[in-house]
Design a protein with these regions (language model features):
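Amphipathic, non-transmembrane alpha-helical segments in extracytoplasmic/periplasmic proteins
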Residues: 45-49, 107, 116-144, 157-181, ...
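Assembly/oligomerization scaffold segments
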Residues: 1-117
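Acidic, small/polar-enriched beta strand-loop surface segments
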Residues: 3-8, 12, 20, 188, ...
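Short alpha-helix capping/helix-loop boundary micro-motifs
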Residues: 49-58, 306-316
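Acidic, low-complexity/disordered segments
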Residues: 5, 319-387, 392
Length: 416
């Protein structure tokens, strides 16, 4: 029997070390377990013990470098459903007047291997998917990379971590990166590919609803907040580049369509209504040919359109909720539809709320504090050497100056 068919009140989160559940004398001291996952970010797990002698992590095998697994289980199904598999990276002690001494264990999934150190590397004549496969193999992570048709003459990892490198490549073409547990093999797998289409969500019908289908008033839901917004959205997105072999600019354009949020409101219509003829033009990376430019414009459109709808739900424990899975929402007015989960948090507090799950369906931007900090950092744009065309050599002051046009930047812009 699937865990999803059982009452959520029967579910708890259990901690395993090397495939064996930790002893009751240790598990009974668990104060909180929290597993947080998000596309384009490593998954993390935090386990908090009430620990008067501050020895539990060592005694139960949760030492730095050891592997830990968290599963949602019931009394009848001790194997349960895995929601986290990773490696312990941090041990911490805390003290509270009310709670006494606490030991805290923090672990991260296999993607943490891609965050150690920075490197400069070149990958000649490869697609981004092929690069992801090479990186995964180099770090001994099983990788599933959805093929992408554009082959680049050279893909450069420019003094950055492998993880930041893969996320940058994925964002450019509308892909996502995350490590998930393969439900068939139980092994952590690095996924590099498009987001799961919202249309794959199960329909919200039937006597026994799917664990991925919900409706307003559902007794599984504790809190729900949903919104739709056209703020900052344009009807189309474009990317520009320069084809060095042809000596011509390349331009890609894609409509703002979303396959991660499907409801009665269309982001393209919102962009046309609020933004008029304006377009969002991507200039942070100069694409090298027409195919790369087209892929970049499609990736930008996917990122913009994904953020127009925002769904946040807190519910009773549900191990089926994971990033890059599709859910359906019924009886929600104009927000009735299907959505792709971008982040989830599974929390188990045995003496307080029990097992709870929360999810967010929104855009692909990093909403963590680190992501907000990075977004606030300003940097100089368009610095370096770029292609230009001389358009006017008649300097009125005879100082040998010329005017330059940058057709990859704009059809009309000319240097002052």
């Amino acid at each position: 029997m699937s865990l999803a068919t059982l009452s959520t009140s029967d579910l708890i989160l259990r901690v395993f070390v090397d495939g064996i559940p930790i002893l009751p004398e240790f598990s009974n001291q668990i104060r909180r377990v929290e597993v947080e996952s998000q596309v384009n970010l490593p998954s993390s797990c935090e386990i908090e013990f009430t620990d008067p002698d501050l020895l539990i992590p060592v005694e139960c095998g949760l030492e730095i470098g050891n592997f830990v697994e968290v599963r949602a289980v019931t009394g009848d199904d001790a194997a349960g459903e895995a929601i986290f598999f990773g490696q312990v990276e941090t041990l911490e002690i805390q003290f509270e007047n009310a709670g006494g001494r606490l030991s805290v264990v923090r672990a991260y999934d296999a993607s943490h291997r891609l965050l150690h150190g920075q490197k400069t590397m070149g990958y000649p004549m490869m697609s981004y998917s092929e690069v992801a496969e090479v990186v995964g193999a180099e770090h001994a992570i099983i990788t599933e990379a959805v093929p992408h048709p554009v082959v680049h003459e050279m893909v450069v990892q420019a003094n950055e971590t492998y993880w930041d490198f893969l996320v940058r490549l994925a964002k450019e073409i509308g892909y996502v990166v995350n490590v998930a547990i393969n439900p068939l093999t139980g092994t952590p797998t690095l996924h590099f590919g498009p987001t799961m289409p919202a249309e794959t969500a199960p329909p919200p019908i039937g006597i026994d609803p799917s664990p991925l289908s919900f409706s307003i008033g559902d007794d599984r839901i504790i809190n729900l907040e949903a919104s739709v917004s056209g703020s900052g959205i344009t009807a189309a997105s474009s990317a520009r580049g320069w084809d060095q072999s042809l000596g011509l600019p390349s331009l890609g354009e894609a409509p703002t369509l979303s396959d991660t949020s499907l409801n009665t409101v269309l982001p393209e219509e919102l962009g046309a209504e609020l933004g008029g003829v304006n377009q969002f033009v991507r200039l942070d990376r100069l694409a090298g040919n027409e195919a790369a430019t087209e892929a970049a414009s499609e990736g930008l459109a996917a990122r913009l359109s994904g953020a127009y709808a925002n769904i946040e739900i807190e519910m009773r424990g549900n191990p089926s909720i994971m990033p890059n899975r599709a859910i359906s929402l019924a009886d929600a007015g104009l927000l009735t539809g299907e959505y792709t989960v971008t982040s989830s948090i599974h929390t188990f507090a045995p003496n307080l709320t029990g097992y709870r799950t929360s999810l967010v369906c929104s855009g692909l931007e990093d909403r963590t504090l680190a992501g907000l900090q990075d977004s606030a950092v300003t940097s100089s744009k368009l610095t370096g050497v770029y292609s230009a065309i001389v358009t006017d050599t008649e300097d009125p002051e005879a100082m040998g100056r010329v005017l330059l046009s940058f057709p990859w930047l704009s059809e009309t812009y000319v240097s002052p």
